C-alpha cells in the first residue's frame, strides 16, 4: 500500500505554537524579548514590536484571556527545547533485569560463581531474576529448590531485597531481587 507523503503525519512532531500572523486574537498580553511585561496591546502593535526587534511573536498561552504572547527567536527556542529533551534522555538510566539460572543440584563452586554474578548485577543497580529449573523427577523435590533460593536470598541480604518471593511458574521456581538504594 502506497501512502502519499502529505497524508503521513509525523507522530513525534509536537504541536507548534501559533507565531506571528498565525495568531488569531485581536489583543494579547505581551512579554518582551528580555522577559519584561509590556502589557495588553493590540496584535498589530505586538507584531510591530517583534518586527523591530527582528524576532518572532509566539503565542505562549492560548487559554488565557487575553492570550499571552512573547517576543523571541522561535527557531532558537525550538532548538533549545530539543537539546534539553536529548540531554534528559541521555541522563536516564535504563534498569535492566538480569537472569541467573540455577538447578536443584547446583554444586558449591558453580553456586559461588553465580552468586558473584548476582552481586555484580545488584551493585550495578540492575534487578536480578533468579530462576531454578526442575527436570523430570526433580519436580518431586521442590523443597530442595526452595532451600536453595532461601540460601541465595540470605547471601544477598546486604546487596538487595526480594521484590518477588519464590513462586512456581510451570517447571521453574522464580524469584526477583531488587538492588538496595544507594545513599
UniProtKB/Swiss-Prot annotation:
UniProt cross-references to PROSITE patterns, sorted A to Z: IF3
Subcellular location, record wording: Cytoplasm
Keyword Protein biosynthesis in record: yes
Entry superkingdom: Bacteria
Molecular-function GO terms, alphabetical: ribosome binding; translation initiation factor activity
Keywords: Cytoplasm, Initiation factor, Protein biosynthesis
Record's keyword annotation contains Transmembrane helix: no
Disulfide bond entries: none
Pfam families, per the entry: IF3_C (PF00707), IF3_N (PF05198)
GO cellular component entries: cytosol; membrane
GO biological process, one term: ribosome disassembly
Protein's job: IF-3 binds to the 30S ribosomal subunit and shifts the equilibrium between 70S ribosomes and their 50S and 30S subunits in favor of the free subunits, thus enhancing the availability of 30S subunits on which protein synthesis initiation begins.
Family: Belongs to the IF-3 family.
NCBIfam families registered for this protein in UniProt: infC (TIGR00168)
Subunit structure: Monomer.
Protein name: Translation initiation factor IF-3
Organism of this sequence: Pseudomonas syringae pv. tomato (strain ATCC BAA-871 / DC3000)
